[in-house]
């Protein structure tokens, strides 16, 4: 479980329509992180963005884009990130991965989370 102190925040940028085999890339990554014992991860869907092709994809009332930006993000120890990075690179496909040093000032507790729910 993630503790307070130095950690790494990993952001994986994908296109909404990207797939790993037959599954959405973000779902494959989230499943892998869950099975790997990561404390928590989130998936964020953007309303507009562009990638290396420099073509802007955005939500419009006329047509919904299937190439909107999606970001999977989690924070974990350097050792755990190093352990997972090879598989994450495979699952991200043509997406990009960004890693930033960060400091966790308050880590979630399973006991407290269970009591709140």
Language-model segment annotations:
Residues 1-117:
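Positively charged, small/polar-rich N-terminal and surface patches that mediate targeting and assembly
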């Amino acid at each position: 479980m993630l503790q307070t102190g130095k950690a790494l925040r990993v952001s994986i940028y994908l296109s909404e329509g990207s797939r790993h085999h037959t599954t959405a890339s973000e779902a494959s990554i989230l499943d892998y992180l869950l099975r790997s014992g990561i404390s928590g991860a989130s998936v964020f869907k953007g309303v507009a963005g562009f990638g290396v092709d420099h073509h802007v994809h955005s939500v419009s009332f006329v047509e919904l884009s299937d190439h909107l930006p999606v970001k999977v993000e989690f924070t974990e120890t350097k050792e755990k990130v190093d352990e997972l990075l090879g598989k994450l690179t495979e699952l991200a496909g043509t997406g990009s991965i960004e890693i930033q040093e960060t400091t966790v000032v308050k880590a979630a507790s399973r006991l407290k989370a269970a009591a709140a729910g």
